Amino acid sequence: QLPAYKEGVEQVVRGANFISVEDPSFIGDYVPDFKALYAPMLYRSFDEYVKLTQSDLVADMRAKAEEQGIKILALHYIYGFRNLITQKVIKTPADLKGMKIRTPGSKSYIDTLSAMGAVATPLPWGETLSAVQQGVVDGLEGSEFTNIGTKVYEGPTKNVANTRHILGTCGVYISTKVWSEIPEKYQAIIQDEFSKGEHHMVELLKSQHGGVVKELESHGVKFNEVDGEAFRDALKPLYVEQEGMTPGVFQAIFTALDAMR
């Protein structure tokens, strides 16, 4: 999966006549600060993330992306917080020890689940449900919308631990070269429509989430809270500045989020 996702961003960087819809963390290959922006367990709500994407801090990241040939049209097509979906109740990192949890092929997901205590097991989504049924993996992670939309609940994984370890979101990108060739009046229309779409997506998720949880519960799914502090402590090694990141970028993100709370 990972090469396919990265290929979309690479096409944009190469100047292809192409719009890419990908996890914004992949922009981190070109602007490392984006990896910090999508580190695990940063956000408590959709609104926190949306406000941060509208800040001067992220405006600077967007400008750096444009220097790399990436025009960002949207950053918050959110599809929900990702939680653990397993057969047994998970409350602490210790409960995950030895458990094989399916992840996407992204390194950030693999590193996150590994730090949380699981044996991260990358699998294509098409193989995931059969792998759960056959016991190849002990569970998976994803949002309630994924759970209901793909009928994960019909399998043996009936427990959802509300880890909220990653905020699932997509961004929309186009080559700066291609963008510059679009007349300004149409640029304004395109940008406005993507911005409206972002807002609509967030409001839709907020309005539907409670109903989705109730529907999952009607199918026998049980939800439980976790020791958030224990998981955050386990994930601290991932809050380390990597090569190319702006010095202090994690602290700047933490400070901005603290100011919202």
Annotate the PLM regions.
Residues 1-48, 56-57, 63-261:
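N-terminal secretory/targeting leader peptides
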Residues 51:
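Short beta-strand-centered segments that line the small-molecule binding cleft or hinge
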